[in-house]
Curated annotation (Swiss-Prot):
Protein name per UniProt: Large ribosomal subunit protein bL21
Gene Ontology molecular function, alphabetical: rRNA binding; structural constituent of ribosome
This protein's encoding gene: rplU
PANTHER family: 50S RIBOSOMAL PROTEIN L21, LARGE RIBOSOMAL SUBUNIT PROTEIN BL21M
Organism lineage: Bacteria, Bacillati, Bacillota, Clostridia, Eubacteriales
Assembly information from the UniProt record: Part of the 50S ribosomal subunit. Contacts protein L20.
Cellular component per GO, a single term: cytoplasm
Organism of derivation: Clostridium tetani (strain Massachusetts / E88)
Length: 104
């Protein structure tokens, strides 16, 4: 059984036990969260349900494992012959979650 869920503006295909890195969620570590934007579900009997736009009554339960920041990305801008140099770094915050249960 798998589901397609939306969180942080991105879509993820998840099964029970999967570990994901998603955009930062406002939740404490070891907290249980519910992802209720389920676009599609594939059941064990081969049935495939597609929502319009979401599947009614479906939700995915997950556990927050970690809050953190990704590796630094360096942004370097320059203009040739003008002595313009600008170096900037960015670290995107993320939440590491583990999918516990898919309710269809």
């Amino acid at each position: 059984m798998y589901a397609v869920v939306v969180t942080g503006g991105k879509q993820y295909k998840v099964t029970e036990g999967d570990v994901l890195f998603v955009e930062k969620l406002d939740a404490e570590v070891d907290a249980a969260i519910e992802l209720d934007n389920v676009l599609a579900i594939s059941k064990d009997n081969g049935e495939f349900v597609v929502g319009k736009p979401v599947v009614e009554g479906a939700k995915v339960t997950a556990k927050v494992l970690k809050q953190g920041k990704a590796k630094k990305v360096v942004v370097f801008k320059y203009k040739p012959k003008k002595h313009y140099r600008k170096k900037q770094g960015h670290r995107q915050p993320y939440t590491k979650i583990q999918i516990e249960k898919i309710n269809a």
